[in-house]
Amino acid sequence: MSSVSLVASAELPTPWGVFTMTGFKEEATGKDHVALSMGDITTDAPVLARIHSECLTGDALFSLRCDCGFQLQAALQRIAKEERGVLLYVRQEGRGIGLLNKIHAYHLQDQGADTVEANEALGFAPDLRDYTICADMLKLLDVKSLRLMTNNPRKIKAMEKYGIPVAERVPLEEGKNAYNEFYLATKAGKLGHMLHD
């Protein structure tokens, strides 16, 4: 049984082109998730894809504390350039701890904690995201395999585990700046992200 149900689809014009926006409802939590796709993603050729966890601060409020907003825009631009691909926008704010807890974590980071230490000080694991819903979204969209834009090895392992082969990892290093250098170093050093700078 799928962890999500497909609810509706509509066109979504963006600065990079017109995507198809597909809405999903997560059965266990009632959360809404979205896929933005372009072109025919149902063929056997691996699909350029991004699994993007919601980040209100980076995606909508232009925060420089993370690389999320930069990655979101770059992923949509790359999909539009290829005229084929899919981006999953998954409602797992703050690596799954939620917006208000993320603000608490930011406060601890302002005091010197890194992103992992801040989550742990609040009683959370460093990363609470569940990628089962992503695999189920892709299956409902009839996506067979991915060229996954990610620096996170957990996403690759999760897709493979849940039956979505990853033919290629496409690096997505965007938006490094003075405000997020420590954050990116922690992602590489403590969370195993594949970053080169």
Curated annotation (Swiss-Prot):
Its EC number is 3.5.4.25. GO terms for biological process: riboflavin biosynthetic process. The active site is at 127 (proton acceptor), 129 (nucleophile). It catalyses: GTP + 4 H2O = 2,5-diamino-6-hydroxy-4-(5-phosphoribosylamino)-pyrimidine + formate + 2 phosphate + 3 H(+). CDD domains: GTP_cyclohydro2. GTP binds at residues 50-54, 71, 93-95, 115, 150, 155. Pathway: Cofactor biosynthesis; riboflavin biosynthesis; 5-amino-6-(D-ribitylamino)uracil from GTP: step 1/4. Pfam families: GTP_cyclohydro2. Coiled coil: none annotated. Its cofactor is Zn(2+). Zn(2+) binds at residues 55, 66, 68. Keywords: GTP-binding, Hydrolase, Metal-binding, Nucleotide-binding, Riboflavin biosynthesis, Zinc. Transmembrane segments: none annotated. Catalyzes the conversion of GTP to 2,5-diamino-6-ribosylamino-4(3H)-pyrimidinone 5'-phosphate (DARP), formate and pyrophosphate. Belongs to the GTP cyclohydrolase II family. This is GTP cyclohydrolase-2. The lineage of its organism: Bacteria, Pseudomonadati, Pseudomonadota, Gammaproteobacteria, Aeromonadales. The gene is ribA.
